[in-house]
């Protein structure tokens, strides 16, 4: 997902606490005049048969689906093998994320945090819990959800979590996050549909590879980061800090903005930016160390590892059409997954909207959006060679019987995934100092352009993690076996998620970016 680093720089759209109408789909973009007017986050790997790279963002799929070009949907339909950053439908992914976040047995957050910091954190969480009823949408209430349940789904068991994960959890306790519960994010939606269509699915990363670097910060660095996070949230609540971008801006750029815009700048870390020229010198040193550590561990090493595993999967499936869906930030900027593939000799071209996709059942005709069905009743397999023509690019509303809180999108590494998408932007103090404190809505982390020394070019030498670890893959045969004994793996986590995220209260928050994510 850079001059001086300030603590986790949090963005907030300061507005009233009242629940407000959902903005128009597409982040207020105008409907495109033609397919060629759409943004395309699709790249084609030139081989026979072709393979595809598709850039996602971690927002409810209904906000972007109408703006995804038909040829991107056709590439997905034509593929037989679909891969994601993590296997979002595997209960192990969920339980591993939950375990990774917990303090050692017998320890609680109050035991490890300084007293003042702990109580500041608790006051902030109490505030969020108080605000959630006003953030909820009528649709959520109509489905029988209540505020305490939503809060516990995100923040449950927070006193048992490691401080670095609490920091990320706080960043996701926002009005936007609460209001989006109930609709799968784009990545998860594609994963669910791929399994329902009996495609072979898999992942190029393991949970531990995303989780362990976060736990690698030393304790003083973690305290610094958590303190800076709370300072930013407190400033937002006091009305003294404003942010240049929100999730709506991200959606708008994805749907109809500039693909090279700073909001998609991938020269970012997946954690908040910590540098600020007003910090004391010793804190600036700490900020630089954190920034450098995560830039290497969560951006450059990840892109190299992901690129190598893409190549391994292509080698193993030379006669298959493969579709790789990663966060868009992995394909934009410098030292990207695409750079790794090109340096290895593969030919990777951006595929504009409107350009025909050549493959089985995908020669020029747009494919329909995957039909949404209840996770409890998986759709029959849809062979790639029998894809009908599209009738509408608009997805239907998820069925009422689908429990929106227990949907697997709850378990995405949300803060990590969000941060992949955000470019670094400078913050500015509010000019009107006499303005009354405003409510804290749509809180997001933003990252500034760096003036620190750029890292060396992405190395291509084998690394233990990229060479010895094989990607997770689930074949259509395995999916058929699952059908014979119970629900498909895309539906099984619906209940498994709850168990995976209930260490002590019903549903602890698990962090995609995810990422990813």
Curated annotation (Swiss-Prot):
Highly expressed in heart and kidney. Also found in white and brown adipose tissue. It is a single-pass type I membrane protein. Divalent metal cations. Mn(2+) or Co(2+). Glycans are attached at residues 227, 334. The chain crosses the membrane at residues 495-515. CDD domains: Tiki. GO terms for biological process: negative regulation of Wnt signaling pathway; positive regulation of protein-containing complex assembly; proteolysis; Wnt signaling pathway. Residues 516-517 are cytoplasmic. Belongs to the TIKI family. This is Metalloprotease TIKI2. Induction: Transiently induced during 3T3-L1 cell differentiation into adipocytes. In vivo, down-regulated by fasting in both white and brown adipose tissues. High-fat diet down-regulates expression in white adipose tissue and up-regulates it in brown adipose tissue. The keyword Metal-binding applies. It is found in: Cell membrane. Residues 20-494 are extracellular.
